[in-house]
């Protein structure tokens, strides 16, 4: 019997993508060794606010720079093409239908794991995919047996921290890869 291929999806606003995102991607990629690894930028996430929202084409460019840095990954633009608010269930149902011969893994953080009961059609979603819970808080994360827990070093970096530092004219080097730092500075993103 042939093994199904493994596809990992890493969703987020990536506004901007930063070093902690790269750490998550790298750790999950090397632990699961998937056939494909997709970054899945959201158009608008249902449980987030949308201040300082950078247009998708700029976020895509930064993800491409991050992929060059990592040496793996592709961008799945299904949510961007759909526009409007995206529910993970709808997105992943479409991906599962297009990838019938694959096991789909979806990365979320412990903060999202604790909110899963609020997710749209969560029980149906759990039947479609395997959640990969990335844990930054403790050494071991108790997760449902149908899920995978991946521990990574804690790194207190957020996209909002980076946007605020840019706005306040503080340095962001080290918080984002050099190529993304240069792109943000050249384009003047998040300055006001």
From Swiss-Prot:
Which NCBIfam families does the entry mention? nicotinate (nicotinamide) nucleotide adenylyltransferase, PRK00071.1-3, PRK00071.1-4
Signal peptide from the UniProt entry: none
Q: Which organism is it from?
A: Staphylococcus haemolyticus (strain JCSC1435)
What's its EC? Answer: 2.7.7.18
The protein's annotated catalytic reaction(s) are: nicotinate beta-D-ribonucleotide + ATP + H(+) = deamido-NAD(+) + diphosphate
Give a yes or no for keyword Protein biosynthesis in this entry.
Answer: no
One GO term in the molecular function aspect is:
nicotinate-nucleotide adenylyltransferase activity
Taxonomic path: Bacteria, Bacillati, Bacillota, Bacilli, Bacillales
InterPro entries in alphabetical order = Cyt_trans-like, NadD/NMNAT, Rossmann-like_a/b/a_fold
* Protein name listed in UniProt: Probable nicotinate-nucleotide adenylyltransferase
Give TM segment ranges.
Answer: none
The protein's job, in short, is:
Catalyzes the reversible adenylation of nicotinate mononucleotide (NaMN) to nicotinic acid adenine dinucleotide (NaAD).
- Top-rank EC class of the record's enzyme: transferase
């Amino acid at each position: 019997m042939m093994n199904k291929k493994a596809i990992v999806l890493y969703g987020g606003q990536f506004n901007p993508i930063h070093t902690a995102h790269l750490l998550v991607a790298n750790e999950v990629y090397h632990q699961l060794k998937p056939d494909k690894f997709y970054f899945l930028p959201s158009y608008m996430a249902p449980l987030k606010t949308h201040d300082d929202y950078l247009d998708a084409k700029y976020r895509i460019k930064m993800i491409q720079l991050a992929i060059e840095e990592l040496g793996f990954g592709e961008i799945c633009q299904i949510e961007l093409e759909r526009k409007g608010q995206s529910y993970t269930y709808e997105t992943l149902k479409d991906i599962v239908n297009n990838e019938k011969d694959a096991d789909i893994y979806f990365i979320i953080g412990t903060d999202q794991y604790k909110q899963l009961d609020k997710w749209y059609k969560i029980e149906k979603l759990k039947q479609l995919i395997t959640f990969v819970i990335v844990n930054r808080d403790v050494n071991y994360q108790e997760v449902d047996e149908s899920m995978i827990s991946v521990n990574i070093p804690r790194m207190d970096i957020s996209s909002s921290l980076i946007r605020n530092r840019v706005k306040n004219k503080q340095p962001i080097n080290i918080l984002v890869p050099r190529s993304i730092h240069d792109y943000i500075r050249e384009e003047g993103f998040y300055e006001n």
